[in-house]
Amino acid sequence: MRTKKVVRRFFAMVMVMTLMLTTSMTVFAATGNRTYKASSKMTIVLNPGQRGDSNTVSIRVSGLPEDAIITKLTVNTGTMSYSGAVVCNSLTISSSNGRTEQIGWTGQANKTLTTSKFLASAANGTYTISFNATNMSSLNLETKSYQPSITIYWDDEF
């Protein structure tokens, strides 16, 4: 009688172990978004009638999961300071993974621009941003500055 009880318990334990090993596991992917602000300003100084590019600012993105992939990337141009009639033509963003995108932009402050060329690329890295503008004045040296930020929407299972 005792061996029968031991055999039943043994088979019960084997059944439980079998179910534990064959049951599928559910793993949840991590997703999220994070905003990174440039530590300096993009600034341009132009002579009358001149067109040119601003200085480039760098934004280091770190702290995301190692396998984080971009699902959306936006650039907020930030606050603006200016003197004169400087008209923006475009904003350029590049990443350390080799992707670059030029976005048409007329210079609005705190404008959110959505990129498309960074989708499915690695999120961690260094991003550089600059803008191109034209001095519409025919008389004076003019300036314009912005302090941009980027928001990275990411997923670690793409």
Describe the predicted segments one by one:
Residues 68-81:
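A short beta-strand element within beta-rich, extracytoplasmic domains
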Residues 9, 21-37:
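Sec-dependent signal peptide cleavage junction
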Residues 95-158:
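Cysteine-clustered segments with highest specificity for TGF-beta superfamily mature ligands
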Residues 30-57:
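Flexible, small-residue-rich N-terminal segments that precede or flank a structured functional core
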Residues 48-64, 110-115, 151:
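Short beta-strands within extracellular/lumenal beta-sheet-rich domains
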Residues 83-101:
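Short, surface-exposed beta-strand/strand-loop-strand elements in extracellular ectodomains
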Residues 63, 79-81, 135:
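Extracellular acidic, Ser/Thr/Pro-rich low-complexity tracts
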